[in-house]
Amino acid sequence: MAVYNYDVVVLGSGPAGEGAAMNAAKAGRKVAMVDSRRQVGGNCTHLGTIPSKALRHSVKQIIQFNTNPMFRAIGEPRWFSFPDVLKNAEMVISKQVASRTSYYARNRVDVFFGTGSFADETSVNVVCSNGVVEKLVANQIIIATGSRPYRPADIDFSHKRIYDSDTILSLGHTPRKLIIYGAGVIGCEYASIFSGLGVLVELVDNRDQLLSFLDSEISQALSYHFSNNNVMVRHNEEYERVEGLDNGVILHLKSGKKIKADALLWCNGRTGNTDKLGLENIGLKANGRGQIEVDENYRTSVSNVYGAGDVIGWPSLASAAYDQGRSAAGSMVDNGSWRYVNDVPTGIYTIPEISSIGKNEHELTQAKVPYEVGKAFFKGMARAQISGERVGMLKILFHRETLEVLGVHCFGDQASEIVHIGQAIMSQPGEANTMKYFVNTTFNYPTMAEAYRVAAYDGLNRLF
């Protein structure tokens, strides 16, 4: 067994692992990266964020073509199969892998491909694909192994018509009807993708409202948009069993209802990738969801072992994971880059997008904060009229006495970009966080950014 010595070993090359490895390497540490795939990038690059967003982009382009009157004048609507649009995602994945591979090379991070597990608190055994075992010894270790879809034991995921959010990328045809069980972020995103391809979607939600953590007006806007685009949302439903057939799949619900479709996509929960890490060898134990507990410095109960990304739970976003990994390494090497990552904007890549940061109306009402609301509807914005993306709104919540911006919520095209203007103002200290910024700032015209000015005037005009 070959033995290699490092200052830091990072388990997992997704966003959290990458952020940790880069920060530790730039602090002068000798770093090794371990990943179970033969390519870097983690689930984010190969099965999650990148392929699903590339799929979404392709589908959005198809929708734009098929709904634009100018294109309708010169030809019939065009429809593409799921495998067709998946080809674009595969090209993006290869480009991402190449970019990330170069990052590790430039920063002299050694990458080991194989299954890593703890031998003890300072060493990791890596079983390579050829069966060779290599031992990495390090002063500090970061767990950033990510998560995978939760699979109930009573569902046969080996059936050719039953998929989860990882295996759906192997779907070789376009179903006419699809059941999506689980209406969280991933379920809603895939509902948008498949409905955009003309698939009838049954979206089964075990709650009474879509994405209940969102501002209720934004959630309602998504529900309304779904109802107009071949998505049937069924709230307050739980599965009894899933019956796989040769010609389809039947979802039996506890309410007594039955739904039949060509395929079923399971999107109900995720579990941390900790079961193969040998945590018992270092005295660590994952919770029931496979996640490990860390403190505000991202340190586990084992003093030299840290955790970051989906494997530690909330918020389970690629954007947050990268910052958590970077901060975990910052805490480890003490280079001043640590921060506790909690000011995270939400980005949901449905069609249209949703993004938000800060408090929503329910939270402010519960806290008895005297707030006011300013809105800008995209249908009145020149840029939206030019682009044809007229669905959506920007909503700003602010303190009616101090004018402090308390929350920004956006539904519509480019929402995940638009929200960052509000985020920048909300992060300003003291009186610099104010609605006055939006009315006293000249925005390029026409842009979607000027929605902030429109919403600010709308809100300030409500004051008396």
From Swiss-Prot:
Keywords for this protein: Cytoplasm, FAD, Flavoprotein, NAD, NADP, Oxidoreductase
GO CC annotations, alphabetized: cytosol
SUPFAM superfamilies attached to this UniProt entry: FAD/NAD(P)-binding domain, FAD/NAD-linked reductases, dimerisation (C-terminal) domain
Catalytic activity: NAD(+) + NADPH = NADH + NADP(+)
Cofactor: FAD
Enzyme class: oxidoreductase
Pfam families linked: Pyr_redox_2, Pyr_redox_dim
Positions that bind FAD: 35-44
Single GO BP term: NADP metabolic process
Cofactor details (free text): Binds 1 FAD per subunit.
InterPro entries hit by this protein: Class-I_Pyr_Nuc-Dis_Oxidored (IPR050151), FAD/NAD-bd_sf (IPR036188), FAD/NAD-binding_dom (IPR023753), FAD/NAD-linked_Rdtase_dimer_sf (IPR016156), Pyr_nuc-diS_OxRdtase (IPR001100), Pyr_nucl-diS_OxRdtase_dimer (IPR004099), STH_gammaproteobact (IPR022962)
EC number(s) from the headed UniProt entry: 1.6.1.1
Record localization: Cytoplasm
Gene Ontology molecular function terms on file: dihydrolipoyl dehydrogenase (NADH) activity; flavin adenine dinucleotide binding; NAD(P)+ transhydrogenase (Si-specific) activity
The keyword Oxidoreductase is annotated on this UniProt entry: yes
Purpose of the protein: Conversion of NADPH, generated by peripheral catabolic pathways, to NADH, which can enter the respiratory chain for energy generation.
Family of this protein: Belongs to the class-I pyridine nucleotide-disulfide oxidoreductase family.
Name by which UniProt lists this protein: Soluble pyridine nucleotide transhydrogenase
Organism: Pseudomonas savastanoi pv. phaseolicola (strain 1448A / Race 6)
